[in-house]
C-alpha cells in the first residue's frame, strides 16, 4: 500500500488545506512549476529554435508518455486543448444528414459533450437512462456512441465492453471519455478496443488545465479523414503546400499551434503517476473511498456513489440537505471539495494517493457536523462554484 508521506511534500497545497477535489483539479506537483520555468527558459534563450528542439513534437511526444499510462501504442494519442475540441475533430470525420446520423449516449454524460452533439442540425441525439440501455439503443442508424468511462457526478464506472461489442456489430464508432478514470482506474485502451478515447490532464493525472488528449485506434486513424484540421495534420507541414495531404496515424487529427506551456505542466503530473503506478493508486483509492463510505454510514449520511468497488471510480458523492450551502461551509473549515446538482448529485470528495486517512476522517466528520447541527443554513443561497 502506498505511504502518502513519501509524496506529500511534492504537492505544496497539501500544507494549507484538506485537499479532496482531485476529481476536478488535482493538486499541482511542485515539478510542474519547475517545468514551466524550463518552458520560459527555452523561450527566452532559444527563441524560435525551441520549435525544432522539442516544442513542435510535443502534441505527439507528450501523448506517447500518456499512452504508457493508458495502455495505448506510440503515435495513437495526440494532445489538444480540451475534450470538446477533441470530440469535434472526431465528429468532423463524418458527413452529417445521411441515414446514419444518430448519436447515442447516457443522460448522465458530461454537459459539454452533450452540447456539442445537440448543436449539430444534421444529427439525431438519443439519450438513454443508464449504461445498460446504451447497447439496446444502438442500431444501424447510429453513427457515434460518446460515453463516459466514469460518470462525473457520482463516480460510477460504466460497463464499456458490451457497448463496444454492440457498436462494432452495428458499424458505429465508440468515443470513450476517460476524464474521470485516467490516473485512478487501471485500464488499457488497446484492450478495451474503443475506436476513440478522450480526456484531459486536470483531474487524477495531476497535469493541470489545457492538456486535453485524443486517442485514435491505429486502424481507425488510417481510414478516416477529419475536416477540422490544421497544418499540424499535414504530412509535410513545413513545405507549406496549398493542398492537404494527411499525416499518418493520429497526427492527422491535429490542428494548429500547440499549447506548449500546458504540455510542459502536464508532463510533471504524468511523471508522478507513472512513478507511483495506476494499480497502486487504485488500491489506495479504493481503501480511501471504502473508509469514506463506512464513515458516512456511521454518521447517517447518504452516499450516492456505488458501493461495489468494481463499479466505483475515485469519487464519493454524498447527498445533503443543501449541497451549495454545505460546500460553502466545508470551504470555511478548510476542506476543499465541490458539489454537483441532483439527480445523482451531492458533495463530491475525491481523495488521491497522497491524501491520508486522517484527512478522509476529518472531512466526513466535518460534513456530518455541518448537516447534524444545521450549520449549513447560514450559507444558504451560496452561489454554485466549480
Regions found by a protein language model. Give the residues of each.
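Pyridoxal 5′-phosphate
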Residues: 1-386
Amino acid at each position: 500500500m502506498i505511504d502518502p508521506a513519501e509524496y506529500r511534500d511534492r504537492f505544496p497545497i497539501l500544507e494549507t488545506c484538506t485537499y479532496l477535489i482531485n476529481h476536478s483539479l488535482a493538486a499541482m506537483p511542485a515539478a510542474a512549476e519547475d517545468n514551466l520555468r524550463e518552458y520560459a527558459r527555452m523561450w527566452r534563450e532559444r527563441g524560435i529554435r525551441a520549435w525544432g528542439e522539442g516544442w513542435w513534437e510535443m502534441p505527439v511526444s507528450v501523448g506517447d508518455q500518456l499512452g504508457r499510462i493508458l495502455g495505448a501504442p506510440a503515435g495513437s494519442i495526440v494532445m489538444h486543448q480540451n475534450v470538446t475540441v477533441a470530440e469535434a475533430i472526431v465528429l468532423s470525420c463524418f458527413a452529417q444528414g445521411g441515414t446514419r446520423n444518430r448519436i447515442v449516449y447516457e443522460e448522465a454524460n458530461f454537459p459539454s459533450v452533450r452540447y456539442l452533439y445537440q448543436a449539430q442540425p444534421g444529427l439525431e441525439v438519443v439519450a438513454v437512462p443508464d449504461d445498460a440501455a446504451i447497447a439496446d439503443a444502438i442500431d444501424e442508424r447510429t453513427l457515434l456512441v460518446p460515453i463516459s468511462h466514469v460518470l462525473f457526478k457520482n463516480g460510477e464506472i460504466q460497463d464499456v465492453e458490451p457497448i463496444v461489442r454492440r457498436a462494432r456489430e452495428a458499424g458505429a464508432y465508440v468515443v470513450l471519455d476517460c476524464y474521470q478514470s485516467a490516473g485512478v482506474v487501471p485500464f488499457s485502451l488497446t484492450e478495451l478496443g474503443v475506436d476513440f478515447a478522450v480526456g484531459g490532464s486536470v483531474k487524477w493525472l495531476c497535469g493541470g488545465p489545457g492538456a486535453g488528449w485524443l486517442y485514435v485506434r491505429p486502424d481507425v486513424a488510417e481510414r478516416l479523414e477529419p475536416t477540422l484540421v490544421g497544418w499540424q495534420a499535414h504530412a509535410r507541414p513545413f513545405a507549406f503546400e496549398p493542398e492537404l495531404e494527411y499525416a499518418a496515424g493520429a497526427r492527422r487529427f491535429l490542428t494548429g499551434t500547440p499549447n506548449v506551456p500546458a504540455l510542459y505542466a502536464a508532463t510533471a503530473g504524468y511523471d508522478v503517476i507513472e512513478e507511483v503506478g495506476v494499480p497502486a493508486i487504485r488500491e489506495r483509492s479504493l481503501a480511501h473511498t471504502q473508509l469514506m463510505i463506512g464513515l458516512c454510514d456511521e454518521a447517517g449520511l447518504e452516499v450516492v456513489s456505488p458501493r461495489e468497488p468494481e463499479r466505483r471510480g475515485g469519487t464519493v458523492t454524498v447527498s445533503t440537505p443543501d449541497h451549495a450551502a454545505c460546500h460553502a461551509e466545508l470551504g470555511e473549515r478548510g476542506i476543499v471539495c465541490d458539489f454537483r446538482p441532483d439527480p445523482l448529485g451531492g458533495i463530491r470528495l475525491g481523495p488521491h494517493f497522497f491524501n491520508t486517512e486522517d484527512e478522509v476522517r476529518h472531512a466526513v466528520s466535518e460534513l456530518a457536523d455541518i448537516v447534524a447541527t444545521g450549520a449549513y443554513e447560514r450559507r444558504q443561497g451560496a452561489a454554485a462554484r466549480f
